[in-house]
Swiss-Prot record:
Protein's name in the database: Lipoprotein signal peptidase
Keywords: Aspartyl protease, Cell inner membrane, Cell membrane, Hydrolase, Membrane, Protease, Transmembrane, Transmembrane helix
Annotated transmembrane regions: 10-30, 68-88, 98-118, 138-158
Listed GO CC annotations: plasma membrane
Localization, UniProt: Cell inner membrane
Annotated active site: 124, 142
UniProt GO molecular function: aspartic-type endopeptidase activity
The protein's annotated pathway: Protein modification; lipoprotein biosynthesis (signal peptide cleavage)
Primary residence: membrane
GO biological process, one term: proteolysis
Function as written in the Swiss-Prot or TrEMBL entry: This protein specifically catalyzes the removal of signal peptides from prolipoproteins.
Membrane topology term: Multi-pass membrane protein
Amino acid sequence: MSQRPNPSALIWLLLSVLVVGLDQWSKAWVLSSLPEYTPVPVIDGFWNWYRTYNTGAAFSFLSDAGGWQLWFFTALAVGISGLLAFWLSRTARGQWRSALPYALVIGGAIGNVIDRLMHGHVVDFIQWYIGSHTWPSFNIADSAIVGGAIGIAVFGLFDKSGKQEPGTGNLR
């Protein structure tokens, strides 16, 4: 009797869909409700809503590169999302330490791709600051990407079960 195959972690793509939905809903709210480049205090001395735009990547990297970066970052995000989705298909459903961060990165990357294709830039609106020190504005998609990247690094560093093949959930 053959063993039943272990279901893949592709079900975790539902989390990616949730991230994309929350990200796009929040950006639609921002575009319809917040003034451009005007702080709206949420927690005085720490957190503002601040509608701004980013044509580059994290911390506005390459934002003044002349336009080619839109297609570069779109292709990069789609490529990485495709690779992570492939790895999800090769990961056992119960391997949440791999599946959760992959799904977060996919959702965040696709959320920002939608912005780039619809608007030519990414809509950012969360601004944290202390005194005159301001963290660059970001959005829900950015948060998911960072959370996923941290998860990949932390779970990869502290995995005590042995070495895993990337995206498989299988031990080497």
